[in-house]
Amino acid sequence: MRRYPICLWLTVLGSIIAVLSVFLTPCFVVRAQGERVVMVEARAGLPFSIHFIHSVQKTPVLENLEINDEKDGFNLLSTKYQSFGVGLPFLAEEGDFREEGDYYIFNHMDRYFRTLSLA
């Protein structure tokens, strides 16, 4: 029977662990029209922003979120928008609200979402 050196076994074991870690690492994936456009490692507190045109108000909205790995979802941290209306936050108890130029800004919102659908 042939004996293999320990360094060969360690190399094989290391390669297996590296491959498994790629497949077992949680990822944050963004898809547009069924195509994957972004995929990054999903780590706690990973910040990201979503910029879109509000469907009712037809004005720009910027939302700042982070990954919440304890609850397996997302926290909405702040939002910035140009007009008041349906679907936009306005209650003072929901965060720190201020007007800045043409924009309304809500900070420290800490709203939790299990999933995000941008359709």
Predicted features by range, described:
Residues 1-6:
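Positively charged n-region of N-terminal signal peptides that target proteins for export
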Residues 7-25:
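Hydrophobic membrane-insertion alpha-helices, especially the h-region
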Residues 15-17, 51-54, 82-84, 116:
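Intrinsically disordered, low-complexity segments enriched in polar/charged residues with Gly/Pro
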Residues 16-18, 36-38, 63-64, 90-94:
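Intrinsically disordered, low-complexity boundary segments flanking structured domains
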Residues 26-32:
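A short beta-strand micro-motif
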Residues 32-81:
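N-terminal secretory signal peptides
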Residues 73-119:
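An exposed acidic His-Trp-rich patch
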